[in-house]
């Protein structure tokens, strides 16, 4: 068949996105791709790199994801009862949904209530610096045409993304907008839910943080694809054969107490040594590719101690990820890393 294309309005022109479908198990994953000959050189790069470019490119990405995402679902004929906004990057889905309801003849007040009643927002970031804020000038450059379609003024739209409506100096925050247009908001653990209540407390003035509709849903993993092969073999040997089909049953997990400490430790060491081998290989290849001094490679890699406690930090190196927390108490850190009886090493890896 023909390539599906979604036309997403930007300024006074359209960005044309190819739609690709990837089958992930039984789930269809739809991807938007602006790198095609219908777009300008500047717009072809919108989908080149996640989190890439300046704030203008970031806004263009979020327009594509949010507004373009809803337009894609419409073109595919997919209509759902609930829309889940996973982090603030996709918050603009609710701008397009309000526009669609108003186009059908509803008032803005009716439209936003319908959107709120069918929207969930998951926040992942525990600090304000991790949320996207856009200056009014930049936001208006791309979103200036939407208030009339929503049946509201420009100031009304800006206020939906402000902690303090009416404050002309405050930037538009995608996360605040998501909170204001979603019936339910959740963090990704009990503690993160509490932190998020405090973080968003200023949105709902006159209420205590715990009175807000910010809750939590604890993050989980997909066991068959997340667990290492070595651990899956251990579980298969000691757990009930129906384990995979009843993973949420606490009784099934009690079988772990029947596994000897020696077997668990052996499995952990196998995994640890695989990690160390991988680090050595990758570090060596990268160092040589960058024309580093070969003699230094041996010196550096020999310092990796398989018998030391290895503490890993694997996250994107953004400021709010707080990789520097390790260095907040240097005296205590010095005591830990200089103890010859209990050696400790740290592995930092970015994305």
Stretches found by the model and what they are:
Residues 1-351:
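Catalytic cores of carbohydrate-active enzymes across secretory and cytosolic contexts
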């Amino acid at each position: 068949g023909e390539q599906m294309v979604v036309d997403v309005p930007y300024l006074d022109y359209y960005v044309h996105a190819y739609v690709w479908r990837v089958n992930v198990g039984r789930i269809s994953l739809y991807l938007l791709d602006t790198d095609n000959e219908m777009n300008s050189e500047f717009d072809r790069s919108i989908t080149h790199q996640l989190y890439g470019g300046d704030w203008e490119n970031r806004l263009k990405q979020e327009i594509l994801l949010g507004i373009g995402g809803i337009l894609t679902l419409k073109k595919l004929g997919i209509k759902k009862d609930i829309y889940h906004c996973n982090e603030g990057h996709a918050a603009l889905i609710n701008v397009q949904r309000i526009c669609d309801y108003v186009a059908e003849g509803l008032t803005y007040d009716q439209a936003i209530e319908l959107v709120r009643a069918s929207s969930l927002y998951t926040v992942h970031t525990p600090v304000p610096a991790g949320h996207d804020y856009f200056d009014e000038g930049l936001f208006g450059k791309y979103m200036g045409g939407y208030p009339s379609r929503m049946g509201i003024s420009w100031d009304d739209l800006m206020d939906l993304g402000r902690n303090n409506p009416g404050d002309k100096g405050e930037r538009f925050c995608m996360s605040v907008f998501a909170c204001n247009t979603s019936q339910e908001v959740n963090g990704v653990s009990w503690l993160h839910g509490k932190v998020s209540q405090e973080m968003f407390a200023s949105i709902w003035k006159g209420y205590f943080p715990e009175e807000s509709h910010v809750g939590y849903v604890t993050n989980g993993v997909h066991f068959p694809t997340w667990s290492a092969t070595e651990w899956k073999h251990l579980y298969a040997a000691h757990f009930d054969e129906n384990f995979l089909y009843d993973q949420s049953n606490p009784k099934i997990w009690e079988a772990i107490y029947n596994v000897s400490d020696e077997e668990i430790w052996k499995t952990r060491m196998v995994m640890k040594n695989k990690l160390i081998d991988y680090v050595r290989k990758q570090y060596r290849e990268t160092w040589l590719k960058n024309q580093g001094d070969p003699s230094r490679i041996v010196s550096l890699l020999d310092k990796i101690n398989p018998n030391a406690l290895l503490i890993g930090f694997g996250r994107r190196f953004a400021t709010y990820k707080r990789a520097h927390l390790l260095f907040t108490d240097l005296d205590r850190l010095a005591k830990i890393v200089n103890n010859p009886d209990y050696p400790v090493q740290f592995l930092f890896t970015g994305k």
